Amino acid sequence: VNKRVLLVEVDNWSLMAGKKISQEAGTAALQDLPAEIATAVRFLLQKIEADHRGGTVELRVPPFGAVQCIEGMNHRRGTPPNVVELTPEVFIALCKGEITPVESMQKPGCSFSGEKADLAFGVFPLLGV
């Protein structure tokens, strides 16, 4: 099976392929979550990637996207050593400050692996969303 991965470099560093989501579009998506959950998640991941550059932790929100964040080590190939995987609903609630990182650890469908995975909790909540 021949698989190809597309990585686009935006502002010298980006793991998310595709067009940047504007502040207006991201904010509108957050206000209309049922219809726009994919755009809302991608917008929030984009903000985390821009504000918390690095490669120590991979933050995944399947099926919508994943970014590497937090300064420190850089991971380039294979399974990352520190992974946080959240459901879209839990991810958005964390970003908006509606739940705490500790509460997110108890939610079904969320997983945390690696000794530095907890560093990702420092990005929540996101200001201005």
Model-derived segments and spans:
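C-terminal interaction segments
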Residues: 2, 6-30, 81-129
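Short, charged/polar surface micro-motifs in flexible loops or helix N-caps
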Residues: 64-67, 73-75
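N-terminal amphipathic/basic helix or basic patch
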Residues: 21, 28, 32-39, 43
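Surface loops and adjacent helix of pleckstrin homology
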Residues: 71-72, 115
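Solvent-exposed beta-strand sheet faces enriched in polar/charged residues
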Residues: 60-62, 113
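A glycine-rich beta-turn/hairpin centered on an aromatic-Pro dipeptide
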Residues: 36-58
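Short connector loops at helix/strand junctions that flank enzyme active sites
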Residues: 52-56, 79, 86-87
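Active-site regions of enzymes building and remodeling cell-envelope glycoconjugates
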Residues: 72-83
